């Protein structure tokens, strides 16, 4: 989205709050907010990712000012006003949605994917990840400059929330595995949206999309986010009552506050409704890594 939209909403809210304040309180509010102005102005100007300390030096005059004085306020504000940010995202993921990086954005994948990279001399290098049978990682620059080929041999995309499950997935022809590490970063999202469009244009076969994550509130929210922002055809994999019952001995207690959140999202997720109902009934969830202890229930 256009970052200016959410910062504009933030300042509009600030104006509305200031209208009903006494002069003394208003001056205190404006004094508190004034120090954040250069930071939000910098966020407003970003058109591509920048490392956190470089952003801080450029717009705030010191490499550590953002992290020490601005970061917590920016994150809480973004969670309130930025539609690309989910309340459940950790700090690093929120900053990535705002184009501020603590480290490079990378996409880990396993399977056959064809794309091209343009060299500095203008020539094009074709790449097929099929040879990396145990998986490979595309760095930030590759995600930015890769051009996905129009012809792909992908029948199924399977996303894993956790790395151990991604690594353990066996290479199979026609399946592209992705590791989401929670929420995909903006560069990963943009790359995967391009891939989705290419696959939609294919007439040879209809691609299936699956996501496998933790059987808890966080896993459900991640599934919902990926389905909303990247792959609208996404289906849950190993995120059902059958899988839950198969691994019930590995359940962990869900805190009361999170249980209340689960109740609020039950109607938002028809594909996960039965699982959510079971989580609420038992008050317990299961982490995806437990599926690797012993194969039970539904597996790839």
Identify the function of each model-found stretch.
Residues 1-179, 184-197, 202-203, 218, ...:
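Nucleic-acid enzyme cleavage-core boundary/entry regions
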Residues 158, 176-179, 208-210, 234-238:
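Short hydrophobic alpha-helical runs that function as membrane-insertion/retention elements
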Residues 197-204, 230-236:
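Arginine/glycine-rich "motif VI" loop of SF2 helicases in the C-terminal RecA-like domain
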Residues 206-216:
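Acidic beta-strand-to-loop metal/phosphate-binding motif
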